[in-house]
Design a protein with these regions (language model features):
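Conserved N-terminal phosphate-binding loop of PLP-dependent enzymes in the Aspartate aminotransferase
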Residues: 1-140
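A short, hydrophobic C-terminal helix/tail in secreted or cell-surface proteins
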Residues: 141-146
Length: 146
């Protein structure tokens, strides 16, 4: 729909990327979408300032108009080495698989708590990307006014 209107599909993988959703390496894969642009960062450098933008050659060439851009996340050999090391650890330590296993366990246990705690609403998520809806006001005991 967005492409039919001349727009681009942009996936922000800053929080959902690098295996956090468990079943897939990228969050957009859960929606069966191939975005035109993907942004990523944070977990990419495991605390080291590193980010990236991935797109097609055609889209990238439209930005090749002489304007330069600089930021603190700009590429350098140290950051690139750290990013590669992070990818190696994700692979070697099977962190994507772990995100799925631990996430499935957490979601199951959190859903089990719903019957004991009325303030817990929906529990949803994939892998270690989990959301818990809470209704803290309905069952909250407020202090008595003086």
């Amino acid at each position: 729909m967005v492409r039919e209107s001349g727009g681009l599909c942009i996936a922000d993988e800053v929080q959902t990327g690098f295996g956090r959703v468990g079943a897939h390496y990228w969050g957009f894969e859960t929606c069966d979408v191939i975005p035109d642009i993907v942004t990523m960062g944070k977990s990419m450098g495991n605390g080291h300032p590193l980010s990236a933008l991935v797109t097609t050659k055609e889209i990238a060439e439209k930005f090749n108009n002489g304007m330069e851009y600089f930021n603190s996340f700009g590429g350098n050999p140290v950051s690139c080495a750290i990013g590669k090391a992070v990818l190696d650890v994700i692979d070697k330590e099977e962190l994507q698989k772990n995100a799925k296993l631990v996430g499935d366990y957490l979601i199951k246990k959190l859903k089990g708590l719903q019957s004991n705690y009325e303030f817990i609403g929906q529990v949803r998520g994939q892998g270690l990307f989990i959301g818990i809806e809470t209704d803290s006001y309905t069952h909250l005991t407020l202090p008595t006014k003086a």
